[in-house]
From Swiss-Prot:
Record GO biological process: glycerol metabolic process; rhamnose catabolic process
Protein name, per record: Rhamnulokinase
Gene designation: rhaB
Function, as annotated: Involved in the catabolism of L-rhamnose (6-deoxy-L-mannose). Catalyzes the transfer of the gamma-phosphate group from ATP to the 1-hydroxyl group of L-rhamnulose to yield L-rhamnulose 1-phosphate.
EC number(s) given by UniProt: 2.7.1.5
Keywords: ATP-binding, Disulfide bond, Kinase, Magnesium, Nucleotide-binding, Rhamnose metabolism, Transferase
SUPFAM superfamilies noted in UniProt: Actin-like ATPase domain
Annotated organism of origin: Listeria monocytogenes serotype 4b (strain CLIP80459)
Length: 483
């Protein structure tokens, strides 16, 4: 029996999940979990990438302690951030977080030189200041000139483990630098940044064998001899693979620090309507596209908890929220002011004051406001997706940590007026494992993998119901007019 390890690292935590296929069912075991985050150093918010590597080795040592001497391994992380590699293969600096303020106004500045419509027609990717395109636009020229390669975070981890440099496609597409038609890094865009296309590793599809873990790591650490497979390295791409969807006319919501809501399509949509609504066409596994919108997600709730010194668990916060009427206050969860404020609680209160609403005071009121606003935003985006794609959406599959928030799931079902299916919460790691298993011949296809997922995990169901959607939508429109 083969053993598979998913290295799944998000913006706030990481984990190593051991998986195996037994009687056509996936069995998972969490081996190691660790915190992730950025710290302010050398003038920027930076990821502790060396510490992340140490946590991976700690997790792999725990796998070996279970008596497993050989395994298959895949890596997925958050997107857009990168490591610059020098001529000798060394890391030139710790990677800067997408939440760093260096890209403020970068979209505006770059698109004043290079038209938005032109960039969107080429890439099909939504405009966000955190995109790699804008990070590289403001990167230190000296570092860029010294860099031989630019590797996104999961590709860097794979490189450290195996010595092989690649640019996996699902994650590379989030850079806003891949040309949809040519299926390559766009030379014109890179030329505008004065970056040679050769600084990027060869584009590699999800499901490709990468290589074996280097001998030096087997000697330094007591870890299994691992075959590394390049999975869908963008965590959302893996989460979509791990979605237990069946049939047609469904949408997905990967709900975690970010909310990513969209549809899996066989071809991108980069027409005027998609451009106007700032939709993105991220590449998916096995020739698919993730037509989606990035929405600020549970990050806002996480920050409320942090401002409260974590006195309440997330379950307690949700319970407190249920004591208040929904939609008393509504915020635009995708307003840039909620990206990384000094104090999230104060920012929400100030927003409500500025938009003529009552001010939420308690932890329950604040949480209620955010969950209600998220559900409303999801419903509005599902409406827009239907208009742009011409496809009727009948089901929404919510995966990731947010699938455990029953209140948010039920509110979404009511506002959107469709059935909502919630779970599994570890869809990203599951999708990571499924791609490994397809590579190794244990699972036939992504469709077959999704059937196995449906048979392996409990999926919650939330029915649609009566709610004053049009009235709430009108109130939200008025709130937006204050901005």
């Amino acid at each position: 029996m083969k053993h598979y390890v998913a290295v799944d690292i998000g913006a706030s935590s990481g984990r190593l999940i051991l998986g195996k296929l037994v009687n056509e069912k996936l069995q998972l075991e969490e081996i190691h979990r660790f915190k992730n985050g950025f710290t302010y150093r050398d003038g920027h918010e930076r990821w502790e990438i060396d510490q992340l590597m140490q946590e991976i080795f700690i997790g792999l040592e725990k796998v070996k302690q279970l008596g497993i001497s050989e395994c298959v391994l895949g890596i997925d992380t958050w997107g857009v951030d990168y490591v610059l590699i020098g001529a000798s293969g060394e890391k030139l600096a710790d990677p800067i977080s997408y939440r760093d303020k260096r890209t403020l106004n970068a979209v505006q500045n770059l698109t004043s030189e290079y038209p938005r419509e032109y960039i969107y027609k080429k890439t099909g990717i939504q405009f966000m200041e955190l995109n790699t395109l804008y990070q590289l636009y403001v990167e230190e020229r000296d570092l860029l000139e010294r860099a031989e390669k630019i590797l996104l975070i999961p590709d860097y981890i794979g490189y450290v483990l195996t010595g092989v440099k690649v640019a996996e496609t699902t994650n590379s597409s989030t850079t806003q630098m891949l040309n949809l038609r040519e299926q390559l890094f766009d030379k014109d865009l890179l030329s505008h940044l004065n970056i040679d296309v050769e600084k990027f590793a060869p584009l590699t599809d999800a499901g490709t064998y990468l290589g074996k873990v280097k001998e030096e790591w087997l000697e330094e650490y007591d870890i299994p001899n691992c075959d590394v497979v390049t999975v869908a390295t963008h965590d959302t791409a893996s989460a979509v693979v791990g979605t237990p969807a069946e049939g047609e006319n469904w949408a997905f919501l990967s709900s975690g620090t970010w909310s990513l809501i969209g549809m899996e399509l066989s071809a991108p949509i980069n027409n005027e309507a998609a451009f106007k609504e700032n939709y993105t066409n991220e590449w998916g596994a096995y020739g698919t596209y993730r037509f989606l919108k990035n929405i600020m997600g549970l990050w806002i709730v996480q920050e409320i908890a942090r401002m409260d010194d974590y006195k309440h668990s997330f379950a307690e916060m949700a319970e407190e929220a249920s004591n208040y009427p929904y939609f008393k206050q509504i915020i635009n969860v995708n307003d840039a002011r909620f990206n990384n404020p000094e104090n999230m609680v104060d920012e929400i209160k100030l927003y409500c004051q500025e938009t003529g609403q009552t001010i939420p005071e308690t932890i329950g009121e604040l949480t209620n406001c955010v969950y209600g606003s998220l559900a409303l935003y999801y419903a509005l985006e599902l409406e827009k997706m239907t208009e742009i794609t011409g496809k009727k959406i009948e089901k929404l599959y919510i995966v990731g940590g947010g699938s455990n928030v029953a209140m948010l799931n039920q509110l979404t079902a009511k506002l959107a007026g469709i059935e909502v299916f919630a779970g599994p919460s570890e869809a990203t790691a599951i999708g990571n494992l499924v791609v490994q298993m397809i590579n190794q011949g244990e699972i036939e296809s992504m469709r077959a993998g999704r059937k196995i997922i449906r048979n392996s995990f409990e999926i919650g169901e939330f029915s649609c119901g009566d709610v004053r959607f049009e009235e709430i939508k009108e109130r939200f429109t008025k709130v937006l007019e204050f901005n």
